[in-house]
UniProtKB/Swiss-Prot annotation:
This is Gag-Pol polyprotein. Its EC number is 3.4.23.-, 2.7.7.49, 2.7.7.7, 3.1.26.4. The lineage of its organism: Viruses, Riboviria, Pararnavirae, Artverviricota, Revtraviricetes. Belongs to the retroviral Pol polyprotein family. CDD domains: trimeric_dUTPase. Residues 459-530 form the Peptidase A2 domain. Residues 971-1093 form the RNase H type-1 domain. One of its GO terms (biological process) is DNA integration. GO terms for cellular component: viral capsid. Mg(2+) 2 binds at D980, E1012, D1032, D1085. It comes from Maedi visna virus (strain 1514 / clone LV1-1KS1) (MVV). Keywords: Aspartyl protease, Capsid protein, DNA integration, DNA recombination, DNA-binding, Endonuclease, Hydrolase, Magnesium, Metal-binding, Multifunctional enzyme, Nuclease, Nucleotide metabolism, Nucleotidyltransferase, Protease, Repeat, RNA-directed DNA polymerase, Transferase, Viral genome integration, Virion, Virus entry into host cell, Zinc, Zinc-finger.
Length: 1506
């Protein structure tokens, strides 16, 4: 074996030094190290496994290749231990080859694992460089300066692998250690000066040591200047240090001497500081002793610092820093209490003043009293202490002379936990209380210390559930280093070292956990990060003293809870869920459900980026069935509404939801199921004991609970500013620092009594403080992310654009800039991956917002000063700013332009929003500053354009562009245009008649309102600068008077009209109420109502009065061969009157030349293109040039005669003989009836009535149909319902897996059905709108389903004017009609489904069958009955309106407000809501009379008789 070993040693000569270094690495906690045999065994085994790599030299690249391959192998069960040993040994060899010195095998494995990702990148880069520069030396990663083959040099950055390796060495051995010096000297051989200094600055280490190193470098530089006077060939200090040089310049050959000098200076500085640190007089070694006073310690420290050969700035830094860090724990705590967050910057004199009493006998007694004080009573000191036994202040419960009292039975002598009469608590009601939900852990009187093995050492750690991290003062360097970590707590910000994968052992439980090494920590703490893994929990004793209020929750009436089966999950997800649920059960947050709790909600899980599983619960169905609670908090608090405070503290409540118990009777509805893989065992069912995540009432219950808990405490502390939103608490005060922190600690103790914990690492003391996305500073506030990302021109997806705009909108309270162009870019395709194109205008708009965000800072509210809100017109938006002092805004905002509102109305809307914001945030009414002049706003208010003004307002010179008031309701000098438009004789027409005699009319499609507006538009186009417009449309009249800005109008016709009007000098608009009795309006009404001869196109000419016809124009040059006929389409469409027809005739000039028009009859209703058929009777070709008159159109009167029957008495030779007189005509209809039945499957009665065949024949057709025989209707449900015209019933039914919403009209039996996605209230309300739009119902009956009885549904029914009633619960007779309809519908649907491809088509066919093809006893279908009822209602309404149409009255007119004599009687020409129109017989004028000056009388008797 010895020979074999020596032979193997010769086989790896290149690894001789590496193996020697590897043998110094310890295998475990003891002194046992790896042997040379272990290394050779590993190398030999690797060569045997990977024969393709056997011949390659053992470089670091080969080792990483082997490492990656080993990771991909899966060893057999019996070889796992050897395989792990092989991996560990290889990791040690790799570390030794890279020059690293891990202490243990475990540390080596951690280092290699950490470098895997970086190594892959390095290999890829290395291959590329080797191809370009084959002359590189072996360890090319240490050469940032690369020699080119073509001459010269180039620079490349320091490799990340090298930088990481240097960081690791500095962290493990120290910044000034020999190991770090040796590594830096090796790698920095060809680094530039700038690279050396930058790498040194970024290394982890003591700040004092870095300051000393910098001082030594400055001394070297001063020495160089003294010894080397300036000259042409002498290097300057800047050249040596690389100041003012680019990387390329510094890499050239002429700078080699400068780089070597800089490298030597750095090495000298490292050695000097290292020797200084080991010298007895080193100030960093001067530390305060426990029995030493602070003054004596400072004297020794200052003496040591003054003796150091360093500059004065470094001495000052050492004095300020070491006077705190090297002080004793007692002095540090005293300085923290007195100096607060500025303790690190305080002078030595201030620290001596703070610690003047530390070490005295009185101070020692005070510390002893604090140490003996029971835990959890920090908030009750001195006279504020209160006995929870008798309720009196001044002593504690254990000191009470009245004896302990039981809080269950009220008797003295025993505690509640020992009470024999105590019974099991029942279900809590509203207002009842219970303790915080916790796991069944052992309860102790004070936080205990337990023995934990950390790495290789046993330590006593304090169990602290308020600490998130596990903190130790020293560590054996086992595990994986993860760099520095910042810890924040009451004492300020502290920096420690983070280590992962550290061996932790508590009793028999062993885990791999994370720790933080903090040498200055006064106590070593076991945090919550490792407590749960080790199975340790802690409950403070005083947490049992107060109970959490319970909020009652329940399901909606008639609901039974969710019963949704758990869907299948993969094995991986089941394992992740099991781990989570087991932990929740152990902590007491979930429990095992009893068998009779049948509700179920599905669960699933997702994997987070950290690799851990997160449990999700699908509470959608439970949320639907649960009654809502009011929101206790309606929005986020805003920092602009906070008052400026001297001290602030931000607290975070840990596990907020999981601390509050769920109302016990409700817990049965929260059950969920853990499946068993492959059904190997029964499923395990759980229920929630606490507020679960994802349940809709968790936020409300939490808010109400915290409100009840904190109400009394807040009232007792009026001197503080208190804010809470969910689990974030804000506390601000102007008290002293110690008093402020005392109140914070008191609050922490107070809510801890209810079981709520405040994690120490999430507590923020002092400014800057981060709260709800804001960053609070002493005099201002801003957003945490205070920059917006840049955007560039080019394509961008809608999803990314929405995220950018969302970031901007969140920050609008500091930006206050509108982005109309970017918002318009978001319109169009709503697909998230659809692309938009960013242009320069969008970039400029975005950059303006980014710049504004950089410049703007928010201020705090001062309750002693008034608040002002200033509004102005921005870029298509209203921008406003809220302030108390000019230039110091509390916040700003933007209200984007609202369509169909004038500028003044938009500013008032924004003022309302501003006022509401100020009242909510500060409780004060602001003084509003409006842009423009005061008289303009008063005029707007008087005209009725705005109906609200702020309580306190004034004006300033703003940028609002007031429109000139050129649209008035008075007569202006100029022509008058009477306009009208609408549906006349079934066609849309519009036009105007001017007082100048000008007339215009045209056919056009559109609604009545659109045609009215189009008539006004045409009049505005043709009218002069000054004109009047008269319309009978109140809608159009009021629109014009509002004088809207055309930029904010949605209606395009209205926008065009306002643009034309604003370009006029002055325009008067007038309204007349009707056409009757007003000559001009009657004239325009008749004018556009006439069916006029209208043409479209240029293929016809106007004719003279004496001409017989209209000439038609040839559209283009036409060639007609001899004897041929050609059809020519001309540019003409014509609309004839009802009593006209037309013919196309030949012109005499063409007939003389042998060219004739053939046919050419145009019917009265024809509206298509006119075509002319031409025949060339010549024996040669004829050419008709373009534009030639070649035919004529002649109008003729239309004569219509009715065709009379033949007549029964007429004598003919045939007489009554022949087929057809036998009476058997119905036989021909049987095939038609069979064909129709095969399509729609009607019943026999419908076939009998529709085709006139005998009833027996129709029944034979139905009986011979196989489909109908297989799908016979079931027996009819019996029951009675309310029936009536326009009264409907509605209900859901299910066909296979599809849901159908069915409506049936109770009078006619008409059915309307739609397939829906689900039985939700939102879906039902959408379908209700469709149903109402088609049938205009009056009343509806439904059952008591959640969708039908929801509050939103009731509000919709009330809005539509539908009387909605519900049937009797659980009584099917109350819904008998719609239930019967369900059976009929599904029976017919089953017959028709095979005939259609889509289910929706089959459903529509079913409605045709039941509504149209199904005939009743009188031969009418449900559709016939429904239409007949609607027509009867219309006729009755019309008859009633005609009876009320003709009215008579007496009236009187007023002069200067005084009523005149009564006149009349006269006929009412038009009546409105508040006035009528009559014609004055004396003056022949039309008068508008208010109803108060009218007395209506019955019509004359002769009219009544008629």
């Amino acid at each position: 074996m010895a020979k074999q070993g020596s032979k193997e040693k010769k086989g790896y000569p290149e690894l001789k030094e590496v193996i020697k270094a590897t043998c110094k690495i310890r295998v475990g906690p003891g002194k046992e190290t790896l042997t040379e045999g272990n290394c050779l065994w590993a190398l030999k085994t690797i060569d045997f496994i990977f024969e393709d790599l056997k011949t390659e030299p053992w470089t670091i690249t080969k080792m990483y290749t082997v490492w990656d391959r080993l990771k991909g192998l899966t060893p057999e069960e019996t070889s796992k231990r050897e395989f792990a040993s092989l991996q560990a040994t290889l990791a040690c060899i790799m570390c030794s080859q890279m020059g690293m010195k891990p202490e243990t095998v475990q540390a080596a494995k951690g280092i290699i694992s950490m470098k895997e990702g970086l190594q892959e990148n390095k290999e890829a880069k290395g291959e590329k460089v080797e191809q370009l520069y084959p002359n590189l030396e072996k360890h090319r990663e240490v050469y940032p300066i690369v020699n080119l083959q073509a001459g010269g040099r180039s620079w490349k950055a320091v490799e990340s692998v090298v930088f990481q390796q240097l960081q690791t060495v500095a962290m493990q051995h120290g910044l000034v250690s020999e190991d770090f010096e040796r590594q830096l000297a090796y790698y920095a051989t060809t680094w530039t000066s700038k690279d050396i200094l930058e790498v040194l600055a970024m290394m982890p280490g003591n700040r004092a040591q870095k300051e000393l190193i910098q001082g030594k470098l400055n001394e070297e530089a001063e020495r160089w200047v003294r010894q080397n006077p300036p000259g042409p060939n002498v290097l300057t200090v800047d050249q040596i240090m690389g100041v003012g040089q680019t990387n390329q310049q510094a890499s050239q050959a002429n700078m080699d001497q400068a780089r070597q000098i800089c490298r030597q200076w750095v090495i000298t500085a490292l050695r000097s500081v290292r020797h200084m640190s080991h010298r007895p007089g080193n100030p960093m070694l001067v530390k305060q002793k426990n029995t030493e006073s602070y003054e004596d310690f400072i004297a020794r420290l200052l003496e040591a610092i003054d003796a150091e050969p360093v500059t004065d700035p470094i001495k000052t830094y050492l004095k300020v820093t070491l006077s705190y860090t090297n002080a004793s724990t007692d002095c540090q705590k005293q300085m923290d209490r007195t100096l607060g967050t500025r303790v690190q910057q305080a002078t030595v004199e201030e620290k001596m003043q703070a610690c003047r009493d530390v070490g005295s006998e009185g101070f020692k007694m005070q510390l002893l009293a604090q140490a003996l004080r029971p835990q959890g009573k920090a908030g009750h000191k001195g006279v504020n202490q209160k006995c929870y036994n008798c309720g009196k202040p001044g002593h504690l419960a254990r000191q009470c002379r009245q004896g302990i009292i039981c809080h269950h039975c009220g008797k003295r002598g025993h505690m509640q936990k020992d009470c024999r009469q105590k019974k099991q608590q029942g279900k809590q009601q509203e207002g009842a209380t219970c303790g915080a939900v916790r796991a069944p852990y052992v309860v102790t009187e004070a936080p205990p210390k337990i023995e934990i093995k950390v790495g290789t050492r046993w330590k006593k750690l304090l169990v602290d559930t308020g600490a998130d991290k596990t903190i130790v003062t020293s560590h054996d360097m086992s595990g994986i280093p993860k760099g520095r970590i910042i810890l924040q707590g009451i004492g300020g910000i502290i920096e420690g070292e983070k280590w992962e994968q550290v061996h932790l052992q508590y009793k028999d439980k062993i885990i791999r956990g994370t720790i933080v090494v903090l040498a200055t920590s006064p106590v070593e703490v076991l945090g919550r990060d490792n407590m749960s893994e080790l199975g340790i929990g802690l409950i403070m004793a005083n947490l049992e003293e107060k109970k959490i209020p319970i909020t009652e929750v329940r399901l909606k009436e008639g609901c039974k809870g969710p019963h949704i089966a758990q869907w299948p999950l993969t094995q991986e997800k089941l394992e992740g869920l099991k781990e989570i649920v087991d932990r929740l059960e152990k902590e007491g947050k979930v429990g095992r459900a009893p068998p009779h709790w049948t509700c179920n909600t599905p669960i699933f899980c997702i994997k987070k980026k950290s690799g851990k599983w997160r449990m999700l619960i699908d509470f959608r169905e439970l949320n639907k069935q649960t009654e809502d609670l009011a929101e206790a908090q309606l929005g986020l608090p805003h920092p602009g509404g906070l008052q400026r405070k001297k001290h602030v503290t931000i607290l975070d409540i840990g596990d907020a939801y999981f601390t509050i118990p769920l109302y016990e009777p409700y817990r049965q509805y929260t059950c969920f199921t853990m499946l068993s893989p492959n059904n190997l065992g029964p499923c395990v069912r759980y229920y929630w004991k606490v507020l679960p995540q994802g349940w809709k009432l968790s936020p409300s219950v939490y808010q109400f609970t915290m409100q009840k808990i904190l109400r009394g405490w807040i009232e007792e502390h009026p001197m503080i500013q208190f804010g809470i939103y969910m689990d974030d608490i804000y506390i601000g005060s102007d008290l002293g620092l110690e008093e402020h922190r005392g109140i914070v600690n008191e609050l922490a103790s107070y809510i801890a009594q209810y079981g709520f914990m405040l994690p120490e690492d999430k507590r923020q003391e002092g400014y800057p403080a981060k709260w709800l996305g804001f960053e609070l500073h002493p005099e201002k506030w801003k957003f945490q992310k205070h920059t917006l990302p840049e955007i560039t021109e080019g394509p961008i997806t809608l999803n990314k654009l929405q995220k950018l705009v969302g970031d901007l909108v969140w920050r609008q309270s500091l930006i206050g800039k509108s982005i109309p162009n970017i918002l318009k870019l978001m319109e169009g395709d709503r697909a998230l991956q659809s692309e938009r194109y960013i242009e320069s205008i969008h970039v400029r708009e975005w950059e303006a917002c980014r710049q504004k965000l950089k410049e703007m800072e928010g201020n705090y509210y001062d309750e002693e000063k008034d608040i002002y809100g200033q509004l102005d017109w921005g870029n298509k938006a209203i921008e406003y700013i809220v302030f108390q002092e000019k230039g110091k805004p509390l916040w700003v905002n933007v209200v984007h332009s609202i369509k169909n509102l004038s500028q003044a109305q938009q500013i008032i809307k924004a003022a309302q929003k501003l006022t509401q914001e100020v009242i909510i945030r500060t409780g004060k009414i602001p003084w509003i500053l409006l842009p423009g002049r005061e008289e303009d706003w008063i005029l707007e208010l008087q005209m009725g354009n705005i109906n609200w003004m702020p309580s306190f307002w004034s004006c300033y010179k703003g940028s609002v562009r007031w429109k000139k008031r050129n649209v008035i309701a008075e007569v202006v000098s100029g022509p008058t245009y009477y306009t009208d438009g609408g549906k006349k004789n079934g066609r849309g027409s519009l036009g105007y008649i001017a007082s100048t005699g000008e007339k215009f009319r045209i056919y056009e499609e559109g609604t009545n309102q659109q045609l009215e507006l189009r008539a006004i538009e045409e009049a505005c186009k043709q009218g002069p600068e000054k004109m009047n417009i008269v319309t009978d449309s109140r809608y159009a009249y009021e629109f014009m008077l509002r004088n809207w800005d055309e930029e904010v109008i949605r209606n395009p016709i209205q926008a065009r009209i306002m643009e034309l009007m604003h370009n006029k000098e002055k325009i008067g608009v007038h309204w007349v109420p009707g056409h009757k009795g007003i000559p001009q309006n009657e004239e325009i009404d008749r004018y556009i109502s006439e069916i006029f001869l209208a043409k479209e196109g240029r293929g016809i000419l106007q004719k003279r009065a004496e001409d017989a016809g209209y000439d038609l124009i040839c559209p283009q040059e036409i060639s007609i061969p001899a004897g041929q006929v050609k059809r020519i389409a001309i540019d003409l469409k014509i609309n004839l009157k009802k009593d006209q027809w037309a013919m196309i005739g030949t012109k005499s000039s063409f007939a003389n030349k042998g060219v004739f028009v053939q046919g050419g009859i145009i019917d009265s209703g024809y509206q298509g293109t006119i075509q002319v058929v031409i025949y060339n009777s010549n024996n040669k070709e004829v050419v008709i040039p373009q534009g030639r008159k070649f035919a004529q159109l002649i109008l003729m009167p239309l004569i219509h005669e009715e065709l009379e029957p033949w007549g029964e008495t007429r004598k003919t030779e045939r007489g009554e003989q022949g087929f057809g007189s036998t009476g058997m005509y119905w036989i021909e209809n049987i095939p038609l009836a069979e064909e129709e039945h095969n399509k729609w499957h009607q019943d026999a009665v419908s076939l009998h009535l529709e085709f006139g065949i005998p009833r027996t024949a129709a029944e034979d057709i139905v009986q011979q149909c196989d489909v109908c025989q297989e799908n016979k209707m079931p027996s009819t449900l019996r029951g009675s319902n309310k029936r009536g015209i326009d009264h409907w019933q509605v209900d859901y039914t299910h066909y296979e897996d599809k849901i159908i919403l069915v409506w049936v009209e109770t009078n006619s039996g008409l059915i309307y059905a739609e397939r829906v996605k689900g039985e939700t209230g939102q879906e039902f309300r959408v379908q209700t709108m469709k149903w109402y739009a088609m049938f205009a119902p009056k009343s509806l009956q439904s059952d008591n389903g959640p969708a039908f009885v929801a509050e939103s549904t009731q509000l919709l029914m009330k809005y539509l004017g539908i009387e909605h009633t519900t049937g009797i619960p659980w009584n099917p007779q109350s819904q008998a009609l719609v239930e019967r309809t369900h059976q009929t519908l599904k029976n017919t649907l089953e017959k028709l489904i095979p005939m259609f491809n889509a289910f929706e088509s089959a459903l529509a066919g079913t409605l045709i069958t039941l509504n149209i093809k199904r005939k009743g006893g009188l031969g009418t279908s449900p559709m016939d009955i429904f239409i007949f009822n609607k027509e009867q209602q219309r006729i009755q309404q019309q008859s009633k309106s005609k009876q009320e149409k003709i009215r008579f009255c007496y009236y009187r007119t007023r002069k200067r407000g005084h009523p005149g004599e009564w006149q009349g009687p006269t006929q009412v020409l038009w009546g409105g809501d508040g006035a009528i129109v009559v014609k004055d017989r004396g003056t022949d004028r039309y008068l508008v009379i208010a109803n108060k000056d009218v007395k209506f009388i019955p019509p004359p008797k002769e009219i009544q008789k008629e």
